[in-house]
Protein backbone atom coordinates (compact mmCIF):
# COMPACT_ATOMS: atom_id res chain seq x y z
CA UNK A 1 0.00 0.00 0.00
CA UNK A 2 2.83 2.31 0.72
CA UNK A 3 4.39 1.47 -2.59
CA UNK A 4 1.27 2.56 -4.35
CA UNK A 5 1.16 5.80 -2.46
CA UNK A 6 4.75 6.53 -3.40
CA UNK A 7 4.09 5.64 -6.96
CA UNK A 8 1.11 7.97 -7.10
CA UNK A 9 3.08 10.78 -5.61
CA UNK A 10 5.82 10.17 -8.12
CA UNK A 11 3.37 10.39 -10.96
CA UNK A 12 1.87 13.56 -9.65
CA UNK A 13 5.33 15.05 -9.46
CA UNK A 14 6.05 14.21 -13.01
CA UNK A 15 2.74 15.69 -14.15
CA UNK A 16 3.55 18.89 -12.41
CA UNK A 17 6.93 19.04 -14.09
CA UNK A 18 5.43 19.16 -17.46
CA UNK A 19 2.99 16.46 -17.99
CA UNK A 20 5.21 15.02 -20.64
CA UNK A 21 3.74 11.60 -20.66
CA UNK A 22 0.23 10.85 -19.76
CA UNK A 23 -0.46 7.98 -17.49
CA UNK A 24 -3.51 5.89 -17.13
CA UNK A 25 -5.34 6.70 -14.00
CA UNK A 26 -6.42 3.68 -12.16
CA UNK A 27 -8.84 3.49 -9.38
CA UNK A 28 -7.54 1.90 -6.30
CA UNK A 29 -9.65 0.51 -3.52
CA UNK A 30 -7.71 1.16 -0.36
CA UNK A 31 -10.38 -0.43 1.80
CA UNK A 32 -10.17 -3.87 0.24
CA UNK A 33 -7.18 -5.97 1.22
CA UNK A 34 -7.70 -8.43 -1.53
CA UNK A 35 -7.95 -5.69 -4.11
CA UNK A 36 -4.84 -4.08 -2.75
CA UNK A 37 -2.95 -7.32 -2.96
CA UNK A 38 -4.17 -8.03 -6.44
CA UNK A 39 -3.39 -4.52 -7.58
CA UNK A 40 0.07 -4.79 -6.15
CA UNK A 41 0.65 -8.00 -8.01
CA UNK A 42 -0.64 -6.45 -11.20
CA UNK A 43 1.64 -3.47 -10.83
CA UNK A 44 4.61 -5.71 -10.29
CA UNK A 45 3.76 -7.73 -13.31
CA UNK A 46 3.29 -4.63 -15.41
CA UNK A 47 6.58 -3.22 -14.28
CA UNK A 48 8.41 -6.38 -15.05
CA UNK A 49 6.71 -6.88 -18.33
CA UNK A 50 6.94 -3.40 -19.65
CA UNK A 51 10.53 -2.85 -18.58
CA UNK A 52 10.35 0.19 -16.57
CA UNK A 53 12.76 2.89 -17.28
CA UNK A 54 16.18 3.20 -15.75
CA UNK A 55 14.88 5.59 -13.15
CA UNK A 56 12.52 2.94 -11.93
CA UNK A 57 15.22 0.21 -12.03
CA UNK A 58 17.14 1.96 -9.29
CA UNK A 59 14.45 1.00 -6.84
CA UNK A 60 14.93 -2.79 -7.29
CA UNK A 61 15.93 -4.62 -4.08
CA UNK A 62 17.74 -7.95 -4.17
CA UNK A 63 15.93 -10.39 -1.95
CA UNK A 64 18.05 -13.48 -2.78
CA UNK A 65 19.75 -15.31 0.10
CA UNK A 66 23.40 -16.17 -0.60
CA UNK A 67 23.72 -19.11 1.78
CA UNK A 68 26.71 -20.70 0.11
CA UNK A 69 30.02 -19.19 1.32
CA UNK A 70 33.29 -19.76 -0.39
CA UNK A 71 36.05 -21.51 1.63
CA UNK A 72 39.30 -19.59 1.72
CA UNK A 73 42.66 -19.87 3.58
CA UNK A 74 41.61 -17.56 6.42
CA UNK A 75 38.67 -19.72 7.33
CA UNK A 76 40.87 -22.84 7.37
CA UNK A 77 43.31 -21.11 9.76
CA UNK A 78 40.51 -20.15 12.10
CA UNK A 79 39.26 -23.71 12.11
CA UNK A 80 42.68 -25.06 13.11
CA UNK A 81 42.98 -22.43 15.81
CA UNK A 82 39.62 -23.43 17.25
CA UNK A 83 40.59 -27.08 17.29
CA UNK A 84 43.84 -26.29 19.10
CA UNK A 85 41.92 -24.26 21.67
CA UNK A 86 39.60 -27.19 22.27
CA UNK A 87 42.58 -29.52 22.73
CA UNK A 88 44.22 -27.13 25.20
CA UNK A 89 41.01 -26.82 27.19
CA UNK A 90 40.77 -30.60 27.39
CA UNK A 91 44.35 -30.79 28.63
CA UNK A 92 43.63 -28.13 31.28
CA UNK A 93 40.55 -30.03 32.40
CA UNK A 94 42.59 -33.21 32.75
CA UNK A 95 45.28 -31.38 34.75
CA UNK A 96 42.64 -29.82 36.97
CA UNK A 97 41.14 -33.24 37.58
CA UNK A 98 44.57 -34.60 38.50
CA UNK A 99 45.27 -31.72 40.90
CA UNK A 100 41.84 -32.15 42.46
CA UNK A 101 42.56 -35.83 43.10
CA UNK A 102 45.91 -34.98 44.67
CA UNK A 103 44.27 -32.37 46.90
CA UNK A 104 41.67 -34.91 47.95
CA UNK A 105 44.39 -37.40 48.90
CA UNK A 106 46.29 -34.69 50.82
CA UNK A 107 43.09 -33.82 52.72
CA UNK A 108 42.57 -37.45 53.71
CA UNK A 109 46.17 -37.69 54.87
CA UNK A 110 45.77 -34.47 56.85
CA UNK A 111 42.63 -35.75 58.58
CA UNK A 112 44.36 -39.03 59.42
CA UNK A 113 47.34 -37.18 60.90
CA UNK A 114 45.00 -34.91 62.88
CA UNK A 115 43.22 -37.91 64.40
CA UNK A 116 46.57 -39.44 65.30
CA UNK A 117 47.68 -36.19 66.95
CA UNK A 118 44.47 -36.04 68.98
CA UNK A 119 44.99 -39.62 70.17
CA UNK A 120 48.58 -38.85 71.18
CA UNK A 121 47.49 -35.69 73.00
CA UNK A 122 44.79 -37.59 74.90
CA UNK A 123 47.25 -40.34 75.86
CA UNK A 124 49.80 -37.77 77.01
CA UNK A 125 47.20 -36.01 79.17
CA UNK A 126 46.16 -39.28 80.82
CA UNK A 127 49.78 -40.26 81.50
CA UNK A 128 50.57 -36.81 82.91
CA UNK A 129 47.54 -37.00 85.22
CA UNK A 130 48.64 -40.42 86.46
CA UNK A 131 52.17 -39.10 87.03
CA UNK A 132 50.87 -36.18 89.11
CA UNK A 133 48.72 -38.52 91.20
CA UNK A 134 51.67 -40.86 91.75
CA UNK A 135 53.89 -37.97 92.83
CA UNK A 136 51.25 -36.68 95.24
CA UNK A 137 50.75 -40.15 96.70
CA UNK A 138 54.52 -40.61 97.08
CA UNK A 139 54.84 -37.26 98.84
CA UNK A 140 51.92 -38.09 101.11
CA UNK A 141 53.49 -41.43 102.03
CA UNK A 142 56.81 -39.75 102.78
CA UNK A 143 55.10 -37.23 105.05
CA UNK A 144 53.07 -39.88 106.87
CA UNK A 145 55.91 -42.41 107.20
CA UNK A 146 57.30 -41.07 110.55
CA UNK A 147 53.81 -40.69 112.02
CA UNK A 148 52.86 -44.19 110.83
CA UNK A 149 55.93 -45.61 112.56
CA UNK A 150 55.05 -43.89 115.83
CA UNK A 151 51.44 -45.06 115.56
CA UNK A 152 52.59 -48.62 114.88
CA UNK A 153 54.79 -48.66 117.97
CA UNK A 154 51.99 -47.24 120.09
CA UNK A 155 49.50 -49.74 118.65
CA UNK A 156 51.87 -52.62 119.42
CA UNK A 157 52.28 -51.32 122.95
CA UNK A 158 48.51 -50.96 123.38
CA UNK A 159 47.82 -54.39 121.86
CA UNK A 160 50.44 -56.30 123.84
CA UNK A 161 49.44 -59.90 124.65
CA UNK A 162 47.95 -60.70 128.02
CA UNK A 163 50.86 -63.05 128.67
CA UNK A 164 53.27 -60.09 128.83
CA UNK A 165 51.08 -58.43 131.40
CA UNK A 166 50.89 -61.66 133.40
CA UNK A 167 54.69 -61.94 133.36
CA UNK A 168 54.97 -58.33 134.54
CA UNK A 169 52.50 -59.04 137.35
CA UNK A 170 54.46 -62.15 138.33
CA UNK A 171 57.68 -60.12 138.43
CA UNK A 172 56.01 -57.56 140.66
CA UNK A 173 54.68 -60.26 143.01
CA UNK A 174 58.14 -61.87 143.20
CA UNK A 175 59.70 -58.54 143.96
CA UNK A 176 57.18 -57.94 146.73
CA UNK A 177 58.00 -61.33 148.25
CA UNK A 178 61.70 -60.50 148.18
CA UNK A 179 61.00 -57.19 149.84
CA UNK A 180 59.06 -58.93 152.60
CA UNK A 181 61.90 -61.39 153.22
CA UNK A 182 64.47 -58.62 153.31
CA UNK A 183 62.38 -56.61 155.73
CA UNK A 184 62.54 -59.37 158.32
CA UNK A 185 66.35 -59.22 158.41
CA UNK A 186 66.68 -55.45 158.49
CA UNK A 187 63.93 -53.54 160.22
CA UNK A 188 65.50 -50.14 159.44
CA UNK A 189 64.97 -50.51 155.72
CA UNK A 190 61.58 -49.26 154.57
CA UNK A 191 59.48 -51.71 152.53
CA UNK A 192 58.71 -48.94 150.08
CA UNK A 193 62.40 -48.47 149.21
CA UNK A 194 63.28 -52.13 148.79
CA UNK A 195 62.00 -52.47 145.24
CA UNK A 196 64.14 -52.04 142.15
CA UNK A 197 63.62 -49.73 139.22
CA UNK A 198 62.44 -52.52 136.81
CA UNK A 199 59.78 -53.56 139.30
CA UNK A 200 58.53 -49.99 139.53
CA UNK A 201 58.41 -49.79 135.75
CA UNK A 202 56.47 -53.06 135.61
CA UNK A 203 54.09 -51.72 138.23
CA UNK A 204 53.49 -48.57 136.23
CA UNK A 205 52.90 -50.72 133.15
CA UNK A 206 50.35 -52.66 135.12
CA UNK A 207 48.62 -49.40 136.07
CA UNK A 208 47.64 -48.60 132.48
CA UNK A 209 43.86 -48.42 131.90
CA UNK A 210 44.10 -51.17 129.30
CA UNK A 211 45.75 -53.68 131.65
CA UNK A 212 43.88 -52.61 134.76
CA UNK A 213 40.35 -52.71 133.37
CA UNK A 214 40.50 -55.02 130.40
CA UNK A 215 43.37 -57.38 131.23
CA UNK A 216 41.09 -60.12 132.56
CA UNK A 217 38.74 -59.90 129.58
CA UNK A 218 41.59 -60.22 127.08
CA UNK A 219 42.87 -63.57 128.34
CA UNK A 220 43.77 -66.50 126.11
CA UNK A 221 46.27 -64.63 123.97
CA UNK A 222 43.77 -62.05 122.66
CA UNK A 223 45.06 -58.59 121.92
CA UNK A 224 43.42 -55.40 123.14
CA UNK A 225 42.23 -53.13 120.33
CA UNK A 226 44.55 -50.22 119.74
CA UNK A 227 43.16 -46.78 120.33
CA UNK A 228 42.42 -44.69 117.32
CA UNK A 229 45.39 -42.47 116.76
CA UNK A 230 45.45 -38.80 115.86
CA UNK A 231 48.93 -37.63 114.82
CA UNK A 232 50.20 -34.41 116.39
CA UNK A 233 52.60 -32.77 113.99
CA UNK A 234 52.41 -29.28 115.47
CA UNK A 235 51.87 -28.20 119.06
CA UNK A 236 51.36 -24.94 120.88
CA UNK A 237 52.19 -24.11 124.48
CA UNK A 238 49.89 -21.74 126.34
CA UNK A 239 51.10 -20.15 129.58
CA UNK A 240 48.62 -18.61 132.03
CA UNK A 241 50.16 -16.13 134.47
CA UNK A 242 48.96 -13.20 136.53
CA UNK A 243 50.43 -9.95 135.24
CA UNK A 244 49.30 -6.36 134.82
CA UNK A 245 51.86 -5.69 132.08
CA UNK A 246 50.92 -5.91 128.38
CA UNK A 247 52.97 -9.12 128.17
CA UNK A 248 55.08 -11.25 130.48
CA UNK A 249 58.85 -10.79 130.47
CA UNK A 250 60.35 -13.99 129.07
CA UNK A 251 63.81 -12.64 128.19
CA UNK A 252 63.33 -12.55 124.40
CA UNK A 253 62.85 -9.61 122.07
CA UNK A 254 59.51 -9.44 120.27
CA UNK A 255 57.94 -7.29 117.58
CA UNK A 256 54.19 -6.86 117.32
CA UNK A 257 52.90 -7.49 113.81
CA UNK A 258 49.14 -7.73 114.27
CA UNK A 259 46.13 -7.52 116.54
CA UNK A 260 42.52 -8.60 116.24
CA UNK A 261 39.42 -9.22 118.31
CA UNK A 262 38.78 -12.84 119.21
CA UNK A 263 35.33 -14.37 119.34
CA UNK A 264 33.90 -14.53 122.85
CA UNK A 265 36.58 -12.33 124.43
CA UNK A 266 36.34 -8.54 124.66
CA UNK A 267 40.11 -8.25 125.07
CA UNK A 268 42.11 -8.04 121.82
CA UNK A 269 44.64 -10.69 120.83
CA UNK A 270 48.12 -9.42 119.92
CA UNK A 271 50.54 -11.28 117.66
CA UNK A 272 54.32 -11.09 118.18
CA UNK A 273 57.38 -12.37 116.29
CA UNK A 274 60.80 -13.09 117.78
CA UNK A 275 63.34 -10.54 116.50
CA UNK A 276 66.50 -11.95 118.09
CA UNK A 277 67.28 -13.66 114.75
CA UNK A 278 66.07 -12.88 111.25
CA UNK A 279 65.00 -16.47 110.54
CA UNK A 280 63.61 -17.35 113.97
CA UNK A 281 60.24 -19.09 113.49
CA UNK A 282 58.90 -18.51 117.00
CA UNK A 283 55.58 -16.68 117.27
CA UNK A 284 53.44 -15.89 120.27
CA UNK A 285 49.92 -14.63 120.94
CA UNK A 286 49.06 -12.52 123.97
CA UNK A 287 45.51 -12.05 125.26
CA UNK A 288 43.75 -11.34 128.53
CA UNK A 289 41.51 -14.02 130.02
CA UNK A 290 37.84 -13.30 129.47
CA UNK A 291 36.84 -14.49 132.96
CA UNK A 292 39.73 -12.93 134.90
CA UNK A 293 41.34 -9.83 133.39
CA UNK A 294 44.36 -10.17 135.70
CA UNK A 295 45.40 -13.42 133.98
CA UNK A 296 47.51 -12.99 130.86
CA UNK A 297 47.47 -15.90 128.40
CA UNK A 298 50.59 -16.24 126.23
CA UNK A 299 50.61 -18.92 123.53
CA UNK A 300 54.00 -19.90 122.07
CA UNK A 301 54.53 -21.67 118.75
CA UNK A 302 57.83 -22.87 117.27
CA UNK A 303 61.39 -23.37 118.50
CA UNK A 304 64.10 -20.72 118.68
CA UNK A 305 66.85 -21.13 116.08
CA UNK A 306 69.41 -18.97 117.87
CA UNK A 307 71.23 -18.90 121.23
CA UNK A 308 69.14 -17.59 124.10
CA UNK A 309 70.24 -15.28 126.90
CA UNK A 310 70.12 -16.66 130.46
CA UNK A 311 66.98 -14.66 131.21
CA UNK A 312 65.09 -16.38 128.39
CA UNK A 313 66.41 -19.90 128.97
CA UNK A 314 63.93 -20.85 131.72
CA UNK A 315 60.74 -20.04 129.82
CA UNK A 316 62.14 -21.33 126.51
CA UNK A 317 63.13 -24.68 128.06
CA UNK A 318 59.74 -24.98 129.73
CA UNK A 319 57.75 -24.35 126.55
CA UNK A 320 60.08 -26.50 124.43
CA UNK A 321 59.80 -29.41 126.85
CA UNK A 322 56.02 -29.12 126.95
CA UNK A 323 55.81 -29.06 123.14
CA UNK A 324 58.24 -31.96 122.81
CA UNK A 325 56.05 -33.96 125.15
CA UNK A 326 53.27 -33.86 122.53
CA UNK A 327 55.43 -34.31 119.44
CA UNK A 328 57.73 -37.09 120.69
CA UNK A 329 56.93 -40.62 121.71
CA UNK A 330 53.60 -42.34 120.95
CA UNK A 331 50.97 -40.29 119.19
CA UNK A 332 48.20 -38.84 121.31
CA UNK A 333 45.03 -40.90 121.11
CA UNK A 334 42.00 -39.24 119.61
CA UNK A 335 39.94 -40.06 122.71
CA UNK A 336 42.39 -38.07 124.81
CA UNK A 337 42.24 -35.12 122.43
CA UNK A 338 38.45 -35.00 122.55
CA UNK A 339 38.43 -34.90 126.34
CA UNK A 340 37.99 -31.46 127.82
CA UNK A 341 41.12 -31.40 130.03
CA UNK A 342 43.66 -34.20 130.67
CA UNK A 343 46.62 -33.89 132.96
CA UNK A 344 49.87 -34.91 131.31
CA UNK A 345 53.31 -35.94 132.48
CA UNK A 346 55.91 -33.23 132.09
CA UNK A 347 59.43 -34.25 130.94
CA UNK A 348 62.47 -33.90 133.25
CA UNK A 349 63.44 -30.36 132.09
CA UNK A 350 59.99 -29.19 133.11
CA UNK A 351 60.46 -30.51 136.66
CA UNK A 352 63.28 -28.03 137.29
CA UNK A 353 61.21 -25.01 136.34
CA UNK A 354 60.51 -22.74 139.32
CA UNK A 355 56.77 -23.08 138.80
CA UNK A 356 56.79 -26.84 138.30
CA UNK A 357 55.54 -27.58 141.79
CA UNK A 358 52.35 -25.59 141.22
CA UNK A 359 51.84 -25.98 137.50
CA UNK A 360 48.82 -27.83 136.11
CA UNK A 361 49.52 -28.97 132.54
CA UNK A 362 46.37 -29.64 130.51
CA UNK A 363 45.56 -30.55 126.92
CA UNK A 364 42.92 -28.58 125.05
CA UNK A 365 40.86 -30.07 122.21
CA UNK A 366 39.09 -26.84 121.27
CA UNK A 367 42.15 -25.25 119.67
CA UNK A 368 42.89 -25.88 115.98
CA UNK A 369 46.28 -27.32 116.99
CA UNK A 370 47.03 -29.57 119.98
CA UNK A 371 47.68 -27.10 122.76
CA UNK A 372 49.19 -27.79 126.18
CA UNK A 373 48.33 -25.21 128.82
CA UNK A 374 50.70 -24.43 131.69
CA UNK A 375 48.69 -22.73 134.43
CA UNK A 376 51.05 -20.69 136.62
CA UNK A 377 48.16 -19.16 138.55
CA UNK A 378 47.57 -22.24 140.75
CA UNK A 379 48.93 -21.95 144.32
CA UNK A 380 51.77 -24.34 145.24
CA UNK A 381 51.00 -27.38 147.45
CA UNK A 382 51.33 -26.58 151.17
CA UNK A 383 50.82 -29.97 152.84
CA UNK A 384 52.60 -33.29 152.65
CA UNK A 385 49.47 -35.09 151.50
CA UNK A 386 48.91 -32.64 148.67
CA UNK A 387 52.56 -32.95 147.58
CA UNK A 388 52.29 -36.75 147.55
CA UNK A 389 49.10 -36.53 145.54
CA UNK A 390 50.80 -34.19 143.07
CA UNK A 391 53.73 -36.64 142.79
CA UNK A 392 51.38 -39.52 142.07
CA UNK A 393 49.48 -37.39 139.58
CA UNK A 394 52.72 -36.64 137.69
CA UNK A 395 53.70 -40.30 137.58
CA UNK A 396 50.44 -41.73 136.22
CA UNK A 397 47.64 -39.21 135.67
CA UNK A 398 45.29 -41.35 133.60
CA UNK A 399 45.23 -44.26 136.02
CA UNK A 400 44.25 -42.12 138.99
CA UNK A 401 41.98 -39.57 137.36
CA UNK A 402 39.84 -41.75 135.15
CA UNK A 403 39.35 -45.04 137.11
CA UNK A 404 38.39 -45.72 140.76
CA UNK A 405 41.06 -47.39 142.89
CA UNK A 406 38.87 -50.41 143.72
CA UNK A 407 38.72 -51.43 140.03
CA UNK A 408 42.39 -52.51 139.85
CA UNK A 409 41.87 -55.84 141.65
CA UNK A 410 40.05 -57.76 144.37
CA UNK A 411 41.75 -58.98 147.53
CA UNK A 412 41.12 -62.17 149.49
CA UNK A 413 39.08 -63.75 146.68
CA UNK A 414 36.21 -61.29 147.15
CA UNK A 415 35.21 -58.62 144.68
CA UNK A 416 34.14 -55.30 146.11
CA UNK A 417 31.82 -53.08 144.07
CA UNK A 418 33.56 -50.06 142.56
CA UNK A 419 33.34 -46.85 144.50
CA UNK A 420 31.90 -44.12 142.28
CA UNK A 421 33.40 -40.76 143.18
CA UNK A 422 31.72 -37.46 142.37
CA UNK A 423 33.41 -35.50 139.58
CA UNK A 424 36.19 -33.52 141.36
CA UNK A 425 37.38 -30.10 140.31
CA UNK A 426 41.00 -31.27 140.03
CA UNK A 427 43.13 -34.36 140.37
CA UNK A 428 44.31 -33.21 143.79
CA UNK A 429 40.74 -33.36 145.10
CA UNK A 430 40.38 -36.82 143.55
CA UNK A 431 43.49 -38.03 145.38
CA UNK A 432 42.24 -36.51 148.65
CA UNK A 433 38.90 -38.27 148.34
CA UNK A 434 40.62 -41.57 147.56
CA UNK A 435 42.90 -41.25 150.60
CA UNK A 436 39.96 -40.62 152.93
CA UNK A 437 38.14 -43.70 151.60
CA UNK A 438 41.04 -46.21 151.68
CA UNK A 439 42.95 -46.54 155.00
CA UNK A 440 45.51 -48.95 153.54
CA UNK A 441 46.33 -46.43 150.84
CA UNK A 442 46.79 -43.76 153.51
CA UNK A 443 49.18 -46.03 155.41
CA UNK A 444 51.23 -46.78 152.31
CA UNK A 445 51.52 -43.12 151.33
CA UNK A 446 52.49 -42.15 154.86
CA UNK A 447 55.21 -44.81 154.91
CA UNK A 448 56.54 -43.69 151.55
CA UNK A 449 56.60 -40.03 152.58
CA UNK A 450 58.31 -40.80 155.86
CA UNK A 451 60.98 -42.77 153.99
CA UNK A 452 61.50 -39.90 151.57
CA UNK A 453 61.75 -37.36 154.36
CA UNK A 454 64.17 -39.55 156.35
CA UNK A 455 66.41 -40.57 153.45
CA UNK A 456 66.54 -37.35 151.46
CA UNK A 457 66.34 -34.72 154.15
CA UNK A 458 69.99 -33.74 153.73
CA UNK A 459 69.57 -33.18 150.01
CA UNK A 460 66.11 -31.57 150.12
CA UNK A 461 65.96 -27.98 149.06
CA UNK A 462 63.38 -25.35 149.68
CA UNK A 463 61.06 -25.11 146.68
CA UNK A 464 60.28 -21.72 145.19
CA UNK A 465 57.11 -19.85 146.03
CA UNK A 466 56.63 -21.59 149.36
CA UNK A 467 56.54 -25.20 148.15
CA UNK A 468 56.97 -28.13 150.56
CA UNK A 469 60.03 -30.38 150.95
CA UNK A 470 58.36 -33.21 149.13
CA UNK A 471 57.61 -30.94 146.20
CA UNK A 472 61.25 -29.84 146.17
CA UNK A 473 62.35 -33.47 145.96
CA UNK A 474 60.08 -33.96 143.00
CA UNK A 475 61.60 -30.96 141.24
CA UNK A 476 65.05 -32.46 141.28
CA UNK A 477 66.31 -32.74 144.89
CA UNK A 478 65.64 -36.41 145.70
CA UNK A 479 67.35 -38.26 142.85
CA UNK A 480 66.55 -41.68 141.42
CA UNK A 481 65.75 -43.26 144.80
CA UNK A 482 63.01 -40.74 145.43
CA UNK A 483 61.52 -41.38 141.99
CA UNK A 484 61.56 -45.12 142.77
CA UNK A 485 59.89 -44.45 146.08
CA UNK A 486 57.19 -42.49 144.30
CA UNK A 487 56.68 -45.40 141.94
CA UNK A 488 56.38 -47.79 144.91
CA UNK A 489 53.82 -45.46 146.44
CA UNK A 490 51.90 -45.59 143.18
CA UNK A 491 52.13 -49.40 143.27
CA UNK A 492 50.73 -49.37 146.78
CA UNK A 493 47.76 -47.40 145.48
CA UNK A 494 46.72 -50.36 143.36
CA UNK A 495 46.51 -52.82 146.27
CA UNK A 496 43.00 -53.88 147.30
CA UNK A 497 41.58 -52.63 150.52
CA UNK A 498 42.05 -55.92 152.35
CA UNK A 499 45.78 -56.49 151.68
CA UNK A 500 49.02 -54.91 152.78
CA UNK A 501 51.41 -53.19 150.34
CA UNK A 502 54.34 -55.31 151.62
Swiss-Prot record:
Residues 96-123 form a coiled coil. The keyword Thylakoid does not apply. InterPro entries: WRKY_dom (IPR003657), WRKY_dom_sf (IPR036576), WRKY_plant (IPR044810). GO terms for cellular component: nucleus. Highly expressed in leaf blades and leaf sheaths. Expressed in roots, culms and panicles. It comes from the Eukaryota. Residues 197-211, 481-493 have a biased composition (Low complexity). Keywords: Abscisic acid signaling pathway, Coiled coil, DNA-binding, Nucleus, Transcription, Transcription regulation. Residues 212-222 have a biased composition (Gly residues). Disruption phenotype: The leaves of the oswrky5 mutant plants retain leaf greenness during dark-induced senescence. The mutant plants exhibit tolerance to mannitol-induced osmotic stress. Enhanced tolerance to drought stress. Residues 75-95, 166-231, 456-502 are annotated as: Disordered. The keyword Zinc does not apply. PANTHER family: TRANSCRIPTION FACTOR WRKY5, WRKY TRANSCRIPTION FACTOR 36-RELATED. Belongs to the WRKY group II family. This is Transcription factor WRKY5. It comes from Oryza sativa subsp. japonica (Rice). The lineage of its organism: Eukaryota, Viridiplantae, Streptophyta, Embryophyta, Tracheophyta.
